[in-house]
Design a protein with these regions (language model features):
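Hydrophobic core positions in small helical hairpin nucleic-acid-binding modules
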Residues: 61, 65, 97-98, 171, ...
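Accessory "access/gating" subregions that flank catalytic or transport cores
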Residues: 193, 197-270
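Mobile "lid/hinge" segments at catalytic clefts and subdomain interfaces of large enzymes
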Residues: 112-199
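Short, small/polar residue-rich loop motifs at catalytic or cofactor-binding pockets
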Residues: 37-40, 103-106
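Flexible, glycine/charged-enriched surface loops at secondary-structure junctions
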Residues: 26-38, 83-84, 179-182, 200-216, ...
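A short, hydrophobic, proline-anchored segment that marks a local hinge/packing element in signaling
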Residues: 104-114, 122, 254-256
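Extended active-site and interfacial segments that coordinate phosphate-rich ligands
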Residues: 59-73, 106-109, 121-158, 268-290
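Short, basic/aromatic recognition patches
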Residues: 14-38, 74, 78-79, 93-98
Length: 344
């Protein structure tokens, strides 16, 4: 096993290159302009446990979704043999690993070498229509998630390399733009397959043990860099309460010490009857982006970068909605999370 600094740096750069190639493949083959022109997507790589292993490519908030989605899949498919080489999983449900809203389809593929699960390649992209009460699957009148489109709670889209046609048919039949959606699905599948192939090649070249050791080393470095930066930030407890356009107040309390960056969002309004809620995972993603920008904005992001971050939310609040709360315009609320912590 090689664990010298040069080999580790090569593997780190190769992980980023794989994510970049996944991004390019999806952009070139997608059929929706929101993917190939707007670039409303993200790609990334996790280790076998679903911990983010590279900064990925695309929208930072999207990349922060991928590890959470994979971890939900690992929990759901925990039985021996439930995850096999060639499988591709799909989720879009914010209450089952999808994190954002139903338009954003997450695809994840396990990476095996010699029968051992060593990593995951994953992507997420906004799809133009996944059903629901309004064209485009987004409506300000939605009061529950069921009105916003088809829910996919982490299912196998590809099993052992073969398409699960029943799932494909269910997805496309529920869309007003089935041909475009199907094309985007295959673009996403091609993307994760390319990523998986590159990771397999990397692990074979340097050995599985070196590959896994390198990812663990990156995460430890990320943790060390973050904790060193924490010591340079102002310490203490900082609070902010800000009135919103509808008269409600959003509140945040941030406590910074040498060992922890604690964000407390528990004292906030109950979830809405409107589609402006966000999932707890979505709230965490926003806190992670802010935390990274404060501690180590110039270094690659991975699981270790966020070990010193703790986020407290209250279940049933707008920042930790319970199903089936509507969540279509989650991003408006998530941006407020970022702003609140930053201004605090």
């Amino acid at each position: 096993m090689k664990n010298d600094s040069i080999t580790l740096e090569i593997i780190q750069s190769s992980l980023q290159a794989a994510a970049d190639e996944m991004f390019a493949a999806m952009r070139k083959t997608a059929m929706s302009s929101i993917i190939y022109e707007v670039l409303d997507m993200g790609t990334g790589i996790t280790d076998a446990q679903g911990r983010i292993a590279s900064s990925g490519a695309g929208i930072p908030a999207f990349i922060g979704v991928l590890d959470k989605a994979v971890q939900v899949l690992l929990t759901k498919y925990s039985a021996d043999g439930a995850i096999q080489p060639g499988d591709v999983f799909i989720t879009n449900d914010p209450y089952y690993g999808g994190v954002t809203h139903l338009n954003d389809l997450v695809l994840a593929m396990p990476v095996f070498v010699d029968g051992k699960l060593i990593a995951w390649s994953a992507n997420i992209a906004h799809n133009s229509d996944v059903g629901g009460m309004a064209p485009g699957s987004l409506s300000g009148e939605a009061t529950e998630l069921f009105q916003e489109g088809l829910r996919l709670p982490g299912v196998k889209l590809i099993s052992g390399g073969q398409p699960n046609q029943d799932i494909m048919d269910i997805i496309t039949t529920n869309s007003r733009m089935p041909d475009v959606l199907l094309g985007d699905l295959w673009a996403g599948i091609a993307s994760v397959r390319i990523g998986a192939r590159r990771l397999e090649e990397l692990a074979v070249k340097y050995s599985v043990d070196t590959f896994i050791s390198a990812m663990n080393a990156f995460m430890e470095t990320g943790d060390q860099v973050t904790r060193a930066a924490l010591k340079t930030l102002p310490h203490g407890t900082f609070e902010l309460s800000e009135e919103q356009d509808d008269g409600r107040f959003f509140n945040v309390k941030v406590t910074i010490s040498d060992e922890e960056f604690l964000v407390d969002l528990r004292d906030n309004p109950d979830q809405d009857a409107a589609p402006t809620n966000t999932s707890r995972d979505g709230t965490i993603v926003c806190a992670q982006m802010l935390f990274k920008s404060l501690t180590s904005p110039d270094t690659p992001a991975n699981d270790g970068s966020f070990r010193a971050l703790t986020v407290l939310t209250r279940e049933g609040s707008i920042f930790h909605a319970q199903e089936p709360a509507a969540i279509g315009f989650y991003f408006e609320t998530e941006v407020r999370v970022y702003d609140l912590i930053w201004r605090c």
